[in-house]
Amino acid sequence: MTEPTRQRWLILAHAFNMDGRAASQTITDKLPHLRRAGIEVVVLSGVSGTRDRVVEHHQLWPAGPAGLRFELRHVLRRRFENRVVYRILMTLASLVLLPGLILEKLLRPVESSWSWWLSAYVKGRALARQQPFDLIYSTGGAFAAHLAGRALKKATGTPWLAEVHDPLITPGNTPHTAQQKMQARVEGLICREADVAIWFTEQALASARARHPGLGERGKMLLPGIDPPFETLPPYQPGSKFIVGHFGSLSATRNLVPFIEALEALQLRRPDLVAATELHVTGGPLDAVSAAKIEQSPVRTCVRHLGRIEADPATGQSGREQILQRMRGVDVLLLLHGEEPICEEYIPSKLYEYLWMQRPILATVHRNPQMAAMLRGEGHVAVQTGGSGQDAGTASRELALALEQMYERWRSPGLPDSGHSSPYTTQAAVGCLLDWATPLVRRPA
């Protein structure tokens, strides 16, 4: 009896093997499970990440000058520690690319990675001629991956599965800029032509179906999750301070202001709580709104900005691994969802990491019942924002109340681990992916 031929998938992911990038982790975490399921994987990605040593991985430069300049910044920064050398090389590269940059800006004023689709198409077409693929799987992130997936489907007839990380159209917004119109066009292509199209929240899928009724049952919702980050959880050891930890990026619409205002309110009636509390902020730079608020706040001494955590060559730990260790060391994990319309259809990937830490989570959730239900279902606190009848201070008041309750538990009897494993795993996500992809694969009898 002849053994069935292994399925061969072409994965298109502009961000891949990039430490700390959610768009990268979403796909790289799936690969071990796909390989265990007998899938032969070939990956096409940009050049900013590290080359994979396990699967066939082709790193491709974009075709356009804006994309070339963007990728060069990452590659040169990684290769040259001397900032002077880096700046000289980038200046020279920018001068060489300048005419093309101006022309591209005039003709195609969209995200710099757009032209990567052409490089991915050309390489994917060449690989398919050598040995056909059973499935094209575009994932992102950058919409260039989906453009390449669609072009390869048309050229080869191979089934196409598209996985959309963040909504391509902001709720309540009519696309008017070149970038927004391009994203709307890409969503239309996905909804009309992908054999399976995946979104990461129920509302994002519902909105896409409302705009494109023809999507029907080809549209799916998938919670990407993450697998257990530790074989054995590092011990949680409370200290003399009540540590609240925020991990991840901040912005003008996802900032620390509600939490700082909660501390300010508590300062008036619970100065003992504020004196014992430290907010540890780990990630990139503070956004301008948070920085301005902290600078003039009477509780500014409670805030410690620890910055971005990079890979440690001494221990071999990636930035992500170090951050996961630090998450285990805090008393409470703070999750800020943001306050812009896209939050209604978006769940931050940080939530899945937090849920594995078994530490109490204090979260703000903006008009996203699915995310609030996930948190509360695991015993955590979700303070909803943006609801009807809520004023600007509602979230801060609710955060203050929740923080006070957590502080009292921390004092006595303590805030022990929950003991609950997260139900949202990459393994489960890949199981769904295989269920949806298997019927698409056409093999001769």
What are these language model-derived features?
Residues D29, L107, E111, L118, ...:
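Membrane-proximal helix-turn-helix segments that form the acceptor-binding/catalytic region
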Residues Q237-R254, I260-L263, A429:
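Conserved donor-binding/catalytic core segment of Leloir-type glycosyltransferases
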Residues G188-G219, A372, L433:
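A short, active-site helix/loop in glycosyltransferases that binds the activated sugar's phosphate group
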Residues A276, G283-G284, A288-Q325:
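Nucleotide-activated donor-binding/catalytic signature segment of Leloir-type glycosyltransferases, i.e.
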Residues Q203, P224-G225:
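Carbohydrate-associated surface elements
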Residues M1-F70, V196, E202-L205, L266, ...:
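N-terminal subdomain of nucleotide-sugar transferases
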